[in-house]
Design a protein with these regions (language model features):
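Phosphate/diphosphate-binding glycine-rich loops and adjacent basic-rich segments that engage nucleotide
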Residues: 148-184
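General beta-strand structural signal in soluble alpha/beta enzymes
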Residues: 83-85, 106, 112-117, 138-142, ...
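Alpha/propeptide regions of enzymes that mature by internal proteolysis
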Residues: 38, 91-92, 96-116, 128
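Generic N-terminal amphipathic, Lys/Arg-enriched alpha-helix
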Residues: 1-23
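Solvent-exposed alpha-helices and their adjacent loops that cap or buttress functional pockets
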Residues: 73-76, 105-107, 132, 155-159, ...
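Active-site cofactor/substrate anionic-group-binding motifs, chiefly glycine-
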Residues: 49-102
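N-terminal glycine-rich anion-binding loops that anchor highly charged ligand groups
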Residues: 8-11, 26-51, 65-76
């Protein structure tokens, strides 16, 4: 039987923050990324938790993820926002946009946001759960480069298209569906 080592969640979060700081990210961005990774681990979504650290480190070293990224609003209306993430940490760009979308939805009743040049966002359930804390329904989805084969195929032809929806309810525990069209 395989034995697992249990690590205190606060120690794990602090370890992740220190790792992101060592890679050159600022404290706020290191905290946001670490919270999203920890959220996934605490819910058994280990594919989107701390095990991603070596991959993120390689992306930073290869220039695919930028510690000094400058997120910019490219276009917006009363209900929509388009941002360029400049290869920031995915959760940092998602958090930036999520806060804008929530405020616009409070102002006009609905809002939509789109991110260009983003990196791995982590578990989408995190973001829709945060939106439900404001009494709103949250929907998140993404497209990407082909990373899975079509039925009967031998090579990648489709994106796994992650999708999540969060619906608030009276019991403080929202209904959250977080899925993709592949197994991770």
């Amino acid at each position: 039987m395989k034995k697992f080592k249990v690590i205190d969640q606060y120690k794990l979060k602090n370890f992740m923050i220190e790792m992101f700081l060592a890679l050159g990210f600022n404290k706020k961005h290191a905290r946001i990324e670490s919270e999203v990774l920890l959220w996934a681990n605490l819910r058994g979504i280990d594919s989107h938790g701390v095990r991603r650290l070596p991959l993120y480190e390689s992306w930073v070293n290869e220039g695919e993820m930028r510690p000094n990224a400058k997120i910019k609003i490219l276009r917006e209306s009363a209900a929509t926002t388009l941002i360029d993430a400049d290869k920031a940490l995915g959760p940092v760009a998602m958090d930036f946009l999520m806060r804008i979308v929530i405020q616009k939805a409070k102002n006009v009743g609905v809002s939509w946001g789109v991110i260009r040049n983003n990196t791995h966002e982590g578990a989408f359930g995190y973001y829709v759960s945060e939106i439900t804390n404001h009494g709103m329904v949250g929907i998140a989805s993404a497209g990407g480069m082909p990373n899975m084969a079509m039925y009967g195929g031998a090579s990648a032809g489709l994106s796994n298209s992650p999708f999540a929806i969060g619906v608030p309810n009276e019991d403080d525990f929202p209904l959250v569906l977080d899925m993709a069209t592949s197994v991770v």
